[in-house]
A protein has these predicted regions:
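Alpha-helical membrane segments of multi-pass proteins
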Residues: 1-209
Length: 209
């Protein structure tokens, strides 16, 4: 799985990715461009994922059978083969921060922006913890789910942008209808090839063909 030294290195890299992505200098760019916001949020989650995996490696290499806290964290990260930590909880966190009211909150106050960054990082940490204990088949299933969710979100944004073109209210006041539409297309196209690849890989890992 890894060594304590690799875990420490992962922690440093993860923190660096989050710090670089949550840079206040980039905040005005998020206000102007939804693709930029999606990219920055993705990097924050990725940084959190590196930290989560590093934490898993550290706990696995350092805890003893008497260490109830570490044992509890490792057990929790493996619930339903990692589905709770890697799929359900991160999805709920991300979904919450992409609701129109949450987007407005994160853009209109320092507290909102801070809570969003922390939440996205936590989503990544949870996924990283679960990743360490997953089988090869679950790795493929998780990557398939991540890209599938990205494509689904892209389709929702495309529909929102397309519907708004016909005159209904724009529920994302910081972004134009065109940005919603183009961001949706971007997310859908980017996810298409990985979804197909990991769907086939997952079936092979499961021995179906």
């Amino acid at each position: 799985v890894g060594t304590p030294l690799q875990a420490k290195l992962g922690l440093i890299i993860g923190l660096a990715v989050i710090a670089g992505s949550a840079n206040p200098v980039l905040f005005p760019l998020e206000l102007q461009s939804e693709p930029t916001k999606v990219s920055i949020d993705t990097l924050i989650i990725f940084g959190g994922g590196i930290i989560g995996y590093a934490l898993y490696v550290y706990l696995l290499n350092s805890f003893t059978s008497n260490d109830t806290a570490a044992n509890g964290i490792l057990r929790a990260s493996r619930l339903l083969k990692g589905v709770v930590f890697a799929w359900i909880l991160p999805a709920l966190i991300i979904l919450f921060w992409y609701l129109p009211s949450s987007v407005t909150f994160s853009f209109s106050s320092f507290l909102g922006a801070f809570l969003e960054v922390v939440s996205m990082a936590v989503a990544g940490v949870l996924a990283g913890l679960a990743w360490g204990g997953m089988s090869k088949a679950m790795h493929s299933a998780t990557l398939f789910t991540v890209f599938f969710m990205s494509g689904t979100m892209g389709e929702l944004l495309t529909e929102e942008g397309g519907i708004n073109v016909f005159g209904t209210p724009n529920y994302f006041p910081y972004y134009s209808q065109a940005q919603l539409l183009y961001t949706g297309y971007m997310m859908w196209v980017i996810s298409l090839i990985p979804v197909t690849f990991y769907a086939v890989k997952m079936l092979r890992d499961l021995g179906i063909f």
